[in-house]
Amino acid sequence: MLTFLKNVFKKGELRQKIIFTLGILFVYRLGAGITIPGVDIGSLSANDATSGIFGIMNLLGGGTLERFSIFALGVSPYITSSIIIELLSMDVIPALTRWRKEGNTGKKKKDRVTRILTLFLSALQGGVLTYAFDSGYGILVNNSIWAYIYVVLIMMAGSLLAIWLGDQITIKGIGNGVSLLIFTGIVSNLPSSFLQTYDNLVTYDSGMWLDIAWYVLFVIVYLSIVVFVVFTEGAIRKIPVNYASSTGVIMKTKEQTHMPIKINSSGVLPVIFASSVLAAPRTIVSFMETTDVTNIINTIFNYQEPVGFCLYILMIIGFTFFYSNLQIDAQKISDDLKKNGGSIPGIRTGIETKNYIKRVLNQITVAGSLTLCIIAAIPIMTPIIWTQTENASISLGGTGLIIVTGVALETVKQIKTYITRKEYHGYIRK
């Protein structure tokens, strides 16, 4: 670790990239604390206005929605747009499917369409959020159409600015900008969450030391979960690959070439989508009058209830299989291997290679989906099994854990790759 940090600060260009990245993140967090003028933050904070689907948006934004800041939407419109465009490129819209196969040129075209869609989605999300919160909690100081339009425009501008800041990190800094913005938002709430948990668990009476022991045990269990998530995020299945030389003879090296496939190639998207699908009906009925129907909906779509929990788990498994096959195109991998003279030992090139990759992907996705279910279920099951933590509040639940560990591991990997590349180029020049 010390050697790694020494190498990081020894490289002048890398040091500048890290400082630039930290500067952009500081600007983003600064804006996250600025409430939109004309919004009554007191009436918003006094209500449970960040539950359901809004709670997911608030988590990803690091509390920006709870404060109704200029970055209230964060990068969520861009993420939603990216997912929609990616889904439509799966043989739904021919143009998008064609762009997907055109490499960097097609990627630029898709990115342009994604940003246009982001503009419309930010307007839609901003309008829905403002209307919902104003109808339910009266957040607008001046309840006029112009005040409504003004707040929506500020939210749109804030979302586009957040995306631009993320782009600057990706281009001039280190790591994926959008992911780091989400990472910073989630991590920024950790200190207050742990302090709140301490206040909830520890009572200053004769049993204080026992309460402190419970809190220490809680932290140890939490850190153990973090280690488990780090392990699962880095777990891969290696498929051996041989490449033929120009003479047709199989090249043999001391270290066999392999193709790595992550156990959890879908990332956190299945959990976010499953949570959003369950939260949407409850969020809608929360603005309605309480009836038998609304009570039934709240029970069915509440993942803390048996039926809702089963739905939650089933949706995570289904979305994991869907997104894994979306992320890893077996046909494309098979074609690339054939084009470059590569083959999997014992498997014929072409259709057999494609079927083999699909079979392996489905096998490891079973493990990946079950892992996601365990991580997502921990925050739900812990208060039931361990009653002392019933009132504990930790913002970094299963969804946040996967995001934070995934982004952290990917950023460290990029830094290590950068250092290795620079050292290799320096060696070549010598």
Question: What do these predicted ranges mean?
Answer:
Residues M1-K430:
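N-terminal cationic and glycine-rich segments that engage phosphates or anionic surfaces
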